[in-house]
Amino acid sequence: MHTKKSLLDDLKKLSIDRNGTLLVHSSMKSIGEVEGGADTVLDALSEYMEPGLLVLPTHTWSYINAENPRFYVDDSPSCVGILTELFRKRPGVVRSLHPTHSVAALGKDAEDFIAGNELFDTPCARGSSWGKLLDRKATIMLIGVDLTRNTFIHGVEEWIDIPGRLTDTHEQLYTVLSDGTEISIPSRRHCGKIWSDHFWKVEDVFLKSGVMYIGQFGDAQARVCDTVSMTKLLFHMLSLDPDLFSDNNPLDEDFAKQFIDINL
């Protein structure tokens, strides 16, 4: 059985920068049996990142829409896992105001990190928390999930303006604050196929180029990605092939090879 101490040891072995910014995507089930359950996992992450900033996604895109347009910052549950839902309710954690792609943060500069997401009409705008991850040279850790859960890649596609990823029209959504104030947020939504299902294609290139490495957190595989080098690599790849994630086929070997030794 895993304990808080053993999970803290795992984070040290993964060489996560305690003083930096860490965003975590997760599958609690994949971690295995933990003394104290999900709360112990969050205790370990929070304690380890106490000098820095810990961020978890608290998305609501699966059910906030034109028919159900109101996102309640305090009450709307996260649709991306039990750890994210428990985390957003913890003391000291603050949640951003984006109606579909909110994040929750704890620690250094948390309020500044989440500020202003409601000003953007897209899911992962460059000026939002998703872009601030790059500004802060953040680390992204995927616990028991693969690159298909890496929302940051959606952001890179958005910043490059890959065609066919977002609706041309806006859906009228609202964010409702603790005091009942409603903020109108007309929003462009992700559209077409579930493009993130294709993000697995770049795993081998990520590993061989040093953008990502794999370790262990509990029973789970932990993929650890650097946002700066990941962004540079994806910019190179998408500039040559804007349709990189438009199909679910493995990368052409010759295409992939040119990025293995690229200077990032």
Which residues does each predicted region cover?
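N-terminal basic/disordered segments at the start of proteins
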Residues: 3-10
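Amphipathic alpha-helical segments in well-structured domains
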Residues: 4, 38-42, 80
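N-terminal active-site beta-alpha-beta segment that forms phosphate/nucleotide-binding
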Residues: 15-69
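Histidine-centered active-site/metal-ligand motif
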Residues: 25, 154-155
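Short, solvent-exposed amphipathic alpha-helical segments in soluble enzyme
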Residues: 39-41, 155-161
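Internal, conserved structured core segments that host functional sites
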Residues: 65-154
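Gly/Ser/Thr-rich active-site loops/lids in small-molecule metabolic enzymes
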Residues: 159-186
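Acidic/aromatic/glycine-rich contiguous surface patches that form carbohydrate-binding/processing clefts
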Residues: 187-264
